[in-house]
């Protein structure tokens, strides 16, 4: 028994290094898998911008910034500064902190949020944990300016983490406070210029003290909730390398102790891509990126394009969002959709309607999205072979799963209209599906809600000619999916 115990003690450091035991060094951290398979399978997530900025509900979620722009740039964001003084009062009388008591979140229900996310087809979900404004949405011991002590007086992150995970989804939290110190410079004479508000308006703190608080907050989110995904906004170049290394090693070690495969997302070049996951805000590559990536995309549209709730929001349609999801997934990405709840914690009905319809499409045709991987090309413009075919062709995107290739049409080719899919050649199919020899088509199926339809095909070196059957009804007014099974 003593021999076994000694052997176990000798091997313990090696076991620790094999799983966990990350050091705050890039070489050690490079053992971390930046994008685990669960994320590549999940494809679609939802999060929210919800915070104090939803009280004024004007301009966008950066109201905190624009209300303080009292110089020549005071007209920024639809006259944000001038409007603030007209509606709420001058900055020497009314500061951003005065919105906090109005941010009550009295109708917030974490279970209702999680239900909405799940019904919309999300496989990971969460919310902003802290935006640029310095207000933490969890129960923090490092700042009095947090949702558990002020405003809602609830641990929003803790409640939502439990609700999301109880429904089998992965939990997401985003941190945007890396530029809180430099974002706004409050001036003497303003209501904000008071030491008691220093931890809200970071610029009033000593810089080293503020950096320590930045790391403490990040580590606190990890220790209390250990999200499956932590998203960092831009400006991580403002954080010293040592602190970034300290955070990553702490997070990865905590996750390993819980048996979780976690992700850190970043923008630009703020982290190495072999350790973290690259995020494109409102954008995506136009061809397949060999490394998985994230696209965060907000539901709002038009003049505001706000991430947080504002009065008079214009919205993208469910068709816009589904088409973006299809485009992103076909290029080896995953889509993160942002919603914008009101200050009371409820979602406007028009936002709920949009994501409900996203969910209808995903619950019906999600097999072409979830768990798929890129085909050899993401997209082509298929050409009809009849005189009345659409002159500029039909947009079709590709995904694949095992020996199945999905063609997702965002333009409906119609019935009995032969369409050439030039990228579906035997060589491309064999490469994509890892098949030896010349593949044969086993079945071609137009997916529909009530019944599926068998399609006619001709499969040759020039591609695959697809003809939808005469009796096929238009399966969806958003996008149609044809599944090709090969053998």
Language-model features and meaning:
Residues 19-487:
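Mature catalytic domains of secreted/periplasmic carbohydrate-active enzymes
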Residues 1-7:
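Sec-dependent signal peptide recognition
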Residues 8-17:
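Hydrophobic h-region of N-terminal signal peptides that target proteins for export
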